[in-house]
Amino acid sequence: MSINKKIEYQEVVQDILDNEEFKKLYLEPHHGISRYEHVLRVSKLTFGFCKIFKVKRISEITRAALLHDFYFDKDLEEYDAYEKLSIHPYKALDNALKYYDLNDLERDIIVKHMYPHTKKRPKY
C-alpha cells in the first residue's frame, strides 16, 4: 500500500483504532491470531480491494470491515459453536453501536458478513 493510501486508510479508521474497548480485541483469540489483528487485516484488504476496483463508499465499507467482529468471547459463552456463527454478528453490531453512528450499509455488512449462517442475504 502506498504511503498516501496508508494515510487515507488511517484517516478512515483512526477513531476506531483509538477506542479503548476496541483495543481489548488484542486479548481475544481468533483464527490463530488476535481478533484485533484479524479485523485489521480484513479492513486493510477491504480498503485495498475497494481502491483497486474503484468501489464507492469506501470509508463505510472499510469501517464495517473493521467492526465486523467487534465482540468478546464472554458475550457468547452460553451458545454452542454453531450458534455463535449466526449470533456473533449481532453482538458485534451492538458493540459498534455503543460507540459509533452506523448507517444502513455499515449495519448490513456487519450483521450479514456470515451469510448464509445469518440466513438473510446482504442487501448491498
Where are these regions (language model features)?
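Metal-dependent phosphohydrolase cores
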Residues: M1-Y124
